[in-house]
């Protein structure tokens, strides 16, 4: 695949310190990606974005992704809730030892699966998935199951 300095390979263990905008909350996120086909955004606004693609030179806003964002409160996670279409609640899922609520919805033309929960260290983690299969045994599921907090 073509190289892209804005989207380096995410192969193996990725450790990112997430920051909740406007607060002192931080969270050290550890997530392991497959050896091929996953890339991450080189720039961070306190989040981590992972992209499954064969060509990191062509990553666009509507492409499949898994995004990890730390927010200061549930109100920040639900900020755009009134804009969501077709919201359906999901069975909670334990990620990194934390039970998270789940939902699916359409927003800005994209379908999303989102898991969110309060972190023991403070703040709320939102994991937003679009265009990535997270059914049991898939790469997306393996990535979510690899999450730990440092």
Language-model features and meaning:
Residues 78-124:
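Signature of long, low-cysteine stretches enriched in small and polar/charged residues
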Residues 1-55, 95, 108-109, 121, ...:
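N-terminal targeting sequences that direct proteins away from the cytosol to non-cytosolic compartments
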Residues 14, 69-73, 98-100, 113:
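Residue-level detection of beta-strand scaffold positions
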Residues 65-67, 90, 128-134:
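Second-shell loop/turn segments in exported
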Residues 50, 68-70, 103-107, 115-117, ...:
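Short beta-strand element of the conserved SAM-dependent methyltransferase core
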Residues 48-79:
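A short acidic-to-branched-hydrophobic micro-motif
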Residues 74-77, 81, 140-144:
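Extracytoplasmic/secreted envelope proteins and their assembly/folding machinery
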Residues 32-36, 64-75, 117-120:
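A short, sequence-level motif marking secondary-structure junctions
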